[in-house]
Amino acid sequence: MEEDLKLQPDSETLTTPNSEVGAVELVKHEEENEQVEQDPGYVTPPEDGKEPVAALSEPNYLGGEDDVLLKHIARQSTIVREALKECTQTPLTVEELSRAYEANLFSPRVPPKKQPNGTCETNPRLNFYPVFAVPEALATYHIFFKNQRIPLSCRANRTRGDGLLHLKAGAHIPEIVSLEEVPKIFEGLGKDEKRAANALQKNETENQNVLVELEGDNARLAVLKRTIEVSHFAYPALNLPPKVMRSVMDQVLIKRAEPIDPQQPDLNSEDGQPVVSDDELARWLGTQDPSELQERRKMMMAAVLVTVELECLQRFFANPQTLRKVEESLHYAFRHGYVRQACKISNVELSNLISYMGILHENRLGQNVLHCTLQGEARRDYVRDCIYLFLILTWQTAMGVWQQCLEEQNLQELNKLLVRARRELWTSFDERTVARQLANLIFPERLMQTLQNGLPDFVSQSILQNFRSFVLERSGILPAMSCALPSDFVPLCYRECPPPLWSHCYLLRLANYLAHHSDLMEDSSGDGLLECHCRCNLCTPHRSLVCNTELLSETQVIGTFEIQGPEQQEGASSLKLTPALWTSAYLRKFIPEDYHAHQIKFYEDQSRPPKVPLTACVITQSQILAQLQAIQQARQEFLLKKGHGVYLDPQTGEELNTPSLSAAASCRSQKHATQGKQASHRATAIPAETTKAVGRGGDVGRQPGRGSFRRGGGGADGELGQPRRGGPRGRGGRNHRQRQGTIFQKTRSEPTSENYPAPATATMFTESQP
């Protein structure tokens, strides 16, 4: 009972001290024999200022003078203190503190250090940031969307969409259009689409849902249309940088309306007025017809708001070098083709590499084989949507860099260029000409090349999946409860798409072209050499083991030789074909002459040979490669046919001429057959001693140390591992242990008597033998 009356010691993890003002203690009520709470009032703190530490009630490895759990708070406090160093004033709100915290974590002034393998070292400061949160400091341009009503002619309402998007050999890269070329837009279902029977009654009362149940819907779209009801979608922003478009609008079309200053009202008199007046435009065009002037203004408006954006998109993505790098990134994202072949030979998962803004990272948590779980139309829709999102992510990254790099001085120079070219723009021949001239001013060649050199990034399917969920959530669609893809809400052609969404239509068509051009729509791999086969121009024929025989021969001699220079020469280098060396050369192997960027032109569909001869990666001379392969094959045959005894690899110590157990069984059966023929003329009952003599008989048996195809001879009844009595050595010692592990090396067709001595140079081989 006395133990129950004592004060219980505080737990070490508590933050409230024992001597706190107003602390509560338990006492014993004498009359009722029960515990009651009493306030002892103010307790005088200790003179030294340190609180007494209560002893632990039970052993705890986290205790001691310094509580290890406090290190977690100390580290976080250090990070917050570093984030506040650059602030001129102490943040007073959570928003300001979060902005400073994210800027210090994700946008430091000093870039992260690079490791020897090229990736950035891990940042332990990120351990305190929410794991699955999207930092606002990184999503500078990706948070902008274009909320618009979904066209009734979108991909989800086209039952024959997969067939319309199918591209055959010879198809070309998609082009852009203008409003002059496509003056009329159709956004209906079309006469070929038939509503489902249960969708007629449903849509009578629900007119807000754009997705219509059709008879020919596939399984995914049928489930999607029964799961969600949507009318608008948040399309990711593809606009040019706002700073650039503001200058274009102010100097070409119409001046912005600024807030009216009551003290100086005359300064804002021209706000909201056209930059080019009717009189000035009539003088430039040489006509006074109001209809012609109005048509010219419509053309300029369409060129500035729609066509110039398409022109910049096409210039950026249609470049052959950009297309090649985009397809290379897709091969990494889908672990496809030559990337899969390199991973197999190097035994390194190259698809774990991701990058952003030119900084390379290694992330082993990403997935790159998710598309392998799908078949048919579902796989094609998923691959097409992944590439569509990848193109959007790449373009938004470029626009974000462009927006952040622009200073006030750059905008002033741009305004001067636009003012100088104003008359030329307004008097151009057509809409496409205006868009090209305007793109030359705002998107010059130097800027485009700079962005193309740093883009696109390496991504994984997990990154694209997170981006997909981010887009769907902004549109009010719960990804976990629906099987929607952002590309489902984009029309398939320009004449069925409203002009504000033409950029998305172009990227969807370009994604479909890249999916076919990269041979991602279908699985072309097989067994054997076809395990990593891909028909695209990046892989076939120069990187394909099926088509390039010299490349196949080179892979067979990887790690089997080492060429050394003269020892007397200083700095003499050696050549050793390692998997890492071969993989690096294999990834860099690209033949631009046989790469057809703007047309689907697979090697297997061509009747002509490649423009550049097929060669290996490292050893490009076929004579040297053939000689190395012949040497390797001769050494293997020598060890298999004429080698006796045990040959050890000087580097690994493994036995080089140890055959399989099947060879030993075949030789044992051959020996029993020979013994049966020699003893057929004798009586049935033969003593054991006679049988042993027959087993060792013949010319081979009389040679000491050469009996029964092995050093040390054979046993009484053909068993392995027993020394013969005429052998030069006994059972014991190291030589006996080596002979125990030796098995047959001869085949049935070889003679039973050979006098070839063991090669004296066998132990000097530096090649790795099978």
UniProtKB/Swiss-Prot annotation:
Residue stretches of biased makeup (Polar residues): 10-19, 742-755
Induction: Expressed in the late phase of the viral replicative cycle.
Chief location: host cell
GO terms for MF: RNA binding
Region (Disordered): 1-20, 30-49, 661-770
Compartment annotation: Host cytoplasm
Compositionally biased residues, Basic residues: 726-739
PTMs per UniProt: Might be cleaved by the viral protease.
Biological process according to GO: intracellular transport of viral protein in host cell; symbiont-mediated suppression of host gene expression; symbiont-mediated suppression of host translation initiation; viral translational shunt
Keywords, sorted A to Z: Chaperone, Eukaryotic host gene expression shutoff by virus, Eukaryotic host translation shutoff by virus, Host cytoplasm, Host gene expression shutoff by virus, Host-virus interaction, Inhibition of eukaryotic host translation factors by virus, Late protein, Methylation, Phosphoprotein, RNA-binding, Translational shunt, Transport
Modified residues (Phosphotyrosine): Y332, Y647
GO cellular component: host cell; host cell cytoplasm
RRM domain: residues covered: 315-433
Stretches for region Binding to host EIF4G: 248-312
TM region(s), chain numbering: none
Entry similarity comment: Belongs to the adenoviridae shutoff protein family.
Known partners and oligomeric status: Monomer. Interacts with hexon protein; this interaction allows chaperoning and trimerization of hexon proteins. Interacts (via N-terminus) with host initiation factor EIF4G (via C-terminus). Interacts (via RRM domain) with viral mRNAs that contain the tripartite leader; this interaction allows ribosome shunting and expression of viral late mRNAs.
HAMAP family: ADV_SHUT
General remark: All late proteins expressed from the major late promoter are produced by alternative splicing and alternative polyadenylation of the same gene giving rise to non-overlapping ORFs. A leader sequence is present in the N-terminus of all these mRNAs and is recognized by the viral shutoff protein to provide expression although conventional translation via ribosome scanning from the cap has been shut off in the host cell.
Designated name of the protein: Shutoff protein
Taxonomic source organism: Human adenovirus F serotype 40 (HAdV-40)
Name of the coding gene: L4
